[in-house]
Amino acid sequence: MQKTTYYESSTLFGGYSYGSTNGFGYEGPQQPFQPGSHVENDFQRSACSLQSLGNTTQHAKSKDLNGSCMRPSLPQEHHPPPTVSPPPNPTTNSTSSNSIPSGSAKVPRVKPTSVQTPSLTKQIFPWMKESRQNSKQKSSSPSTETCSGEKTPPGSSASKRARTAYTSAQLVELEKEFHFNRYLCRPRRVEMANLLNLSERQIKIWFQNRRMKYKKDQKSKGMGSSSGGPSPTGSPPQPMQSSAGFMNALHTMSSNYDAPSPPSLNKPHQNAYAHVTNYQNPIKGALQQKYTNTAPEYDPHVLQGNGVAYGTPSMQGSPVYVGGNYVDSLPTSGPSLYGLNHLPHHQAANMDYSGPPQMPPSQHHGPCEPHPTYTDLWPAQPTHLLGGQNPGGPKLTHL
């Protein structure tokens, strides 16, 4: 309505010329050039007259756009002047000024005293220009414009984006997808958008909101379990589960390496079990010699037994000498480790209680053959248990 009233007033003014200094030459096309006195007399006859000429220039703008003053002046000329009722001046002023809409009160900013006939039809004021907000409001809700031409303020609810209402089928699919994957890649998001008839933006926003909801739920569960113990209905939060699983894994790893010590000292046959358990330390030492090629740890025990050397250092460092290395370390290191110093060394012949019968000294083979001094010193040593037949490790058949 604002634009229509403005252009109607411009067409009314466009066909007429301002004949007087007051600018009120709008009585009709038959009398375009009228003297000022005649215009004032005709203007006093109208229903919208004013008292003083000083007020006429001020209120002429509003009466031009008012509906009661925009009818043509031809019927006024045909009617006799006494038929027009004399207007009450103050009331008509107030009603004419109050009936003007607030939006259209700003329309004629051009002063009527200055003659601007060509510029009236082309001038566009700032409030008439189309803005981005106005175009959005027109496209979304065309009924927001009121009858007086005033538009709703931009911060009202009509300018906000409408809330997306998801159907139950869409929510089921979205929840199912969120259960398997909390973050969607773009190809999967495009596929979900085509499947559910939604836009990618809607799916992305739904997943963002769902992640925030999940985070809030986990936080509330964590606070509830820390204050009042774990809830009976729900599982503990995911960080607590992962830490518990990690601790369990560490516990199983440590329990694998905590091998129980053999009950050798509690058995009646202390000598046999003491020597068998003593094999473990030389095995570790021999493996270290095998892989690191360093000097053997048990050099003072291995190299000399009762003042007799059992081999060169090169042979002792080699893997072939491993079997002999175990046996050589027995007489000096074994009894002293377990506090069996009171036992003489010649009792080693009676040590094997559960193994097969002993082999004669002539049948020693493997690394024990090239050492005749070894068999002479220890004729009754159970070499089949000490790694004589298997240089890689001892056969502990009685355990």
Swiss-Prot record:
Locations listed in the record: Nucleus
Key words, A-Z: Developmental protein, DNA-binding, Homeobox, Nucleus, Transcription, Transcription regulation
A biological process from GO: embryonic skeletal system morphogenesis
UniProt key word Cell division: no
Cellular component annotations (GO), alphabetically ordered: nucleus
Chain intervals with Polar residues compositional bias: 44-59, 113-122, 134-164
Region ranges (Disordered): 18-164, 214-244, 352-399
Molecular function terms, GO-annotated: DNA-binding transcription factor activity, RNA polymerase II-specific; RNA polymerase II cis-regulatory region sequence-specific DNA binding
Major site of localization recorded for this protein: nucleus
DNA-binding region extent: 159-218
Amino acid composition bias (Low complexity), ranges on this chain: 91-104, 221-232
Motif (Antp-type hexapeptide): 124-129
Composition bias, Pro residues: 81-90
Its biological purpose: Sequence-specific transcription factor which is part of a developmental regulatory system that provides cells with specific positional identities on the anterior-posterior axis.
PANTHER family in UniProt: HOMEOBOX PROTEIN HOX-B3 (PTHR45664:SF11), PROTEIN ZERKNUELLT 1-RELATED (PTHR45664)
Family stated for the protein in its record: Belongs to the Antp homeobox family.
Protein name from the UniProt record: Homeobox protein Hox-B3
Gene symbol of the encoding locus: HOXB3
